[in-house]
């Protein structure tokens, strides 16, 4: 099978270059593209690739239980391969135009299951080495922080796609839309569909206190422009929010996983929980505050623009 690694073809499978990390562009995306092409050639679905990535990641977590550097290195390799599969599932979905809410939910579940495996095995390793079982309490706090940080980063990264590329590129539905879908769907006969909407609702509701101004802005857009983002707002959002992408990415996968790898090689993996609780929470608090202030400014600009226009112009100012 001939595999084409032309740069433009790989870039066609990005969500958007603005939200891609350096290591993703030059490492995970090219490998993911190769895996996606291979998966397509043997007719694997994106969800199958996601499940394979989850299994690989869970096994890597188990290998972090052992004190042997050699075994830990194998675990690190498997975790990197799991990340490549995580990249490949989305690239395959975009390549085959088979993106779905089910795929997105499964992708999120996969990430949480992998880190659950890592957390549990790190705790068991710490206890096996003769230390306190209180490490589980620390791990639970770190896990809760991890969930909020990663959910926040993922939510606003999708928000960036919503405003800069358009609503159809955003993988997260609005709260009102999801509530309506949840009320309309019946558990009987539509269990899976309703469960997917339920998971996404819980995800959005868990971020309510961190996304107040953003919800005001999106509600205004839905009401006035019917989700047709005006070009001036798209440009202003990109100019103001593009620098925030580094914080979104810092709070999701790569930074925490490479920190974990370094601590494993230093034989101090328990410090990973401290990194989660202290360093990443400081980054999160700073980024969340900065994001809220930037969005408030965009809300004030949007209100000023819409208040000063006749109704007819409001509907014409669309992309």
Language model regions located:
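Select subsegments of transmembrane alpha-helices in polytopic membrane proteins
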Residues: 46-51, 107-115, 245-254
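Long, highly hydrophobic alpha-helical transmembrane signal-anchor segments
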Residues: 106-181
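Transmembrane alpha-helical segments that form the membrane-embedded catalytic/substrate-channel core
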Residues: 81-87, 144-160, 282-293
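Membrane-embedded alpha-helical segments that form the functional core of polytopic membrane enzymes
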Residues: 46-102, 115, 119, 135-145, ...
């Amino acid at each position: 099978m001939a595999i084409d690694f032309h740069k433009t073809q790989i870039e066609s499978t990005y969500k958007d270059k603005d939200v891609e990390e350096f290591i993703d562009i030059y490492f995970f995306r090219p490998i993911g593209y190769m895996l996606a092409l291979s998966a397509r050639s043997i007719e694997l679905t994106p969800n199958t690739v996601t499940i394979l990535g989850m299994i690989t990641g869970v096994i890597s977590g188990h290998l972090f239980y052992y004190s042997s550097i050699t075994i830990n290195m194998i675990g690190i390799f498997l975790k990197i391969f799991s990340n490549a599969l995580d990249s490949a599932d989305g690239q395959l979905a975009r390549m085959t135009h088979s993106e779905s809410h089910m795929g997105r939910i499964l992708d999120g579940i996969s990430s949480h299951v992998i880190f659950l495996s890592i957390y549990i095995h790190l705790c068991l390793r710490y206890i096996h080495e003769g230390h306190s079982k209180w490490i589980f309490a620390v791990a639970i706090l770190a896990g809760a922080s991890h969930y909020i940080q990663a959910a926040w980063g993922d939510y606003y990264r999708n928000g960036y796609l919503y405003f800069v590329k358009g609503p159809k590129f955003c993988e997260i539905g609005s709260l009102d839309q999801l509530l309506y879908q949840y009320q309309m769907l019946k558990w009987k006969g539509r269990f899976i569909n309703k469960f997917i909407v339920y998971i996404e609702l819980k995800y959005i509701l868990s971020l309510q206190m961190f996304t107040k101004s953003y919800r005001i802005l999106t509600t205004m857009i839905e009401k006035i422009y019917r989700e047709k983002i005006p070009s001036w707002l798209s440009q202003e959002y990109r100019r103001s929010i593009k620098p925030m992408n580094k914080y979104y990415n810092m709070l999701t996968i790569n930074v925490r996983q490479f920190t974990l790898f370094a601590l494993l090689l230093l034989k101090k993996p328990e410090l990973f929980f401290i990194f989660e609780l202290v360093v990443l929470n400081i980054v999160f608090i700073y980024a969340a505050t900065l994001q809220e202030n930037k969005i408030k400014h965009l809300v004030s600009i949007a209100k000023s623009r819409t208040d000063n226009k006749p109704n007819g112009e409001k509907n014409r100012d669309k992309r």
